[in-house]
Amino acid sequence: MLSPEENELVTRTGAGTPMGAVMRRYWMPAALAWELPPDCPPIRIKLLGEKLVAFRDTEGRVGLIDEFCAHRRASLFLGRNEEGGLRCVYHGWKYDTKGNCLDMPNEPAETNFKHAVRLKAYPTAEVGGVIWAYMGPAEKVPPLPKFEWTQVPQNYRHLSKMRQECNWLQALEGAIDNAHAGFLHRALTDKTTRAGLRGYWENSQAPRLDVHITDYGFMYTATRALPERENYVRAYQYVMPFHQFFPSQIAHSGSAAKLKKPTVRGHMFVPMDDENSMVYNWTYTFADQPLTEADSEQLGRHIGSAPEELTADFRKVRNKDNDWLIDRQVQKTETYTGIEGITTQDHAIQESMGPIVDRSRERLGSTDKAIVAARRLLLQTAKTVLEGGDPPGIDTSYYSIRAVERVLPDGVDCLEALKSEVNPLNTHEA
């Protein structure tokens, strides 16, 4: 449970807020690379409450600049991407990827006025099929986010994104929560073709949670007791401030688990503003064979991010305005929720709480350890940054981490058994 004041601190990310200052110290996803082919029309981007446009110029450089022209504040979303810059269609002012004004055709040729005009622009980098942006102090740019999934060949990973209509922390906490999976995502029968989980998830609906603090965030394990003196252990990773890793390596029953290749999956919960998030979903395989087209289609259906499931601006077709198209008959006979898509099920729950949930009214239990740890870490980080310090997770210690799941004999030290696979550095109990 947080106080109302603490809740405000961790949820608000606009300019001048403590958590906004934290976010600006990291590289943040701004777009998927395929959204910006060369010389494409500009696209709208909203990050931390700022309205921006992104475009790729003739040389392949990506610009992320203020949406509004410096002249009369017309939207550059309506602009023309031409010959190395973005031109406003109102009076023809043209800007390069760094926000410099290149041309003012409505001003006398001899004037130097254009050299005095510059739009706000943020550095960008293309890594792993994602366009990343850095919005913080120029003297504190961190290393690029080279997670393992960003370094594999393109056909070994699957990327998507979708809007979540609630605060970023709400979205993140929905993913960090492990205990919900055996309820929210449960398939009621193996015969259903709808997204759902069975198998080990059903053995224990009250997993034991352990949190291990790292220098990038924390690793947490969820342990479920199985018959024959065994435990099903899932090790997750939380990388500050909005990354979550989860494993998919054991062939469970249930339609949501039909992808047989071992994978690590995850989400990035990026604040658009205080009441909306853009969730980037990634999956990569470390098998010998790449993901096939059928694998990618299955992942899209599983997540709820298939083309037919999203609008042009990445809003879910199944959304709060239509009650996520819940099917009460399916809820009775096939899946626990009656909502299609594992990630859509997550979104529905978090969005149902309202734009920013009042955490002062919660009653947390033993399976909420990871959520409590994340909140403590965020509050401490906000204090650290406010005092001039550096936040965790801006170095390279997380580059090779993985999330894993294993069946281990009873009595085995999970952290010790999984250490070589998850690569947690400098861990200690939370």
Task: Please name every model-derived segment.
Residues 15, 61, 138-430:
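C-terminal catalytic domain of Rieske-type non-heme iron oxygenases
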Residues 27-31, 53, 63, 130-132, ...:
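Ordered hydrophobic segments in well-structured contexts
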Residues 24, 118, 125-127, 263, ...:
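A short, structural micro-pattern
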